[in-house]
A protein has these predicted regions:
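Short loop/turn segments that flank or connect secondary-structure elements
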Residues: 1-268
Length: 268
């Protein structure tokens, strides 16, 4: 886990220094997945965004409660103060009963090769690997190529000169268009929810903590649960926008409703 954390910190430093290759959707990069399953083991950082949760729940045909209990960890972000979800990896046992590591609950194996049991509904961070996404306000989305130097697929691709096109690797034009539309909506929400309500004060003020728990539950419902699971991905995007608007309305209502108890107006 420490190695993974150190690698993430190294990536961030490299990005800030502009030392990571940045790619546009029509550009090529070296990579070839060899189905070794290494990137699906010993991790605690596979966060699920609302679009990921929608597709996985639709694929598994599960309620949010059942999905979380079986596959995920639901927690509150220390900094964001938002309800967040990540995949709960499962322990791997040796014959002697000792735990030797962890693995993704969706990792399968056939004839020595590893595969994802929910391939059609893979979370973004999984199907996009080894690419990460960078989207600055008002600018075209770019993708950074991350490689820790030990990935067998990256080594094979470099040795054999195997190339991928960003757009094709990410599932094609239509899928990537939807991903970028979702990311724009989600980025808007993340950039603005603190402008609707002082969520930091809400979470830290003892008088307001019960109100925060109520807001947190409503936000979780609207971000992850309040969808028609018979709809397609485009339908999800429409519902997601409606749900973001609802969080804004609820937040502003709470600010006014409890004004006599605590000032929850956004920081100026």
């Amino acid at each position: 886990m420490n190695e993974e954390k150190n690698y993430k910190e190294k990536l961030m430093k490299m990005y800030v220094k502009r030392e990571l290759p940045l790619l546009k959707r029509n550009e090529k990069f070296n990579f070839a997945c060899v189905q070794c399953g290494e990137c699906c083991r010993n991790r605690d950082d596979i966060l699920l965004n609302p679009f990921d949760v929608f597709r996985l729940r639709r694929e598994k045909k599960m309620s949010l409660q059942d999905f979380v209990e079986k596959y995920c960890e639901f927690y509150t972000g220390n900094t964001s103060k938002l309800p967040l979800m990540r995949i709960q990896f499962r322990p791997v046992y040796e014959l002697n009963g000792f735990v030797t590591g962890t693995r993704c609950p969706f990792l399968g194996q056939t004839e020595g090769l590893y595969h994802c049991r929910v391939h059609k509904a893979k979370p973004f961070v999984c199907f996009s690997y080894p690419l990460g996404r960078i989207q600055e306000l008002g600018k075209e989305t770019e993708y950074l190529l991350q490689n820790d130097g030990t990935c067998k697929g990256a080594v094979k691709a470099k040795d054999e000169k195997i190339m991928q096109v960003v757009e094709d690797w990410m599932g094609g034009k239509e899928k990537l268009d939807r991903e970028e539309r979702f990311n724009a909506l989600y980025s808007y929400f993340l950039a603005n929810y603190r402008k609707w309500i002082n969520v930091d004060k809400l979470a830290e003020n003892k008088k307001a903590f019960s109100i925060y728990k109520k807001w947190l539950a409503l936000a979780a419902e609207l971000l992850y649960a309040n969808y028609d699971f018979d709809s397609d991905d485009d339908g999800f995007l429409e519902q997601f926008k409606t749900n973001i608007d609802a969080i804004e309305t609820i937040s502003e209502t709470i600010v006014e409703e409890f004004a006599s108890l605590v000032d929850l107006h956004p920081k100026s």
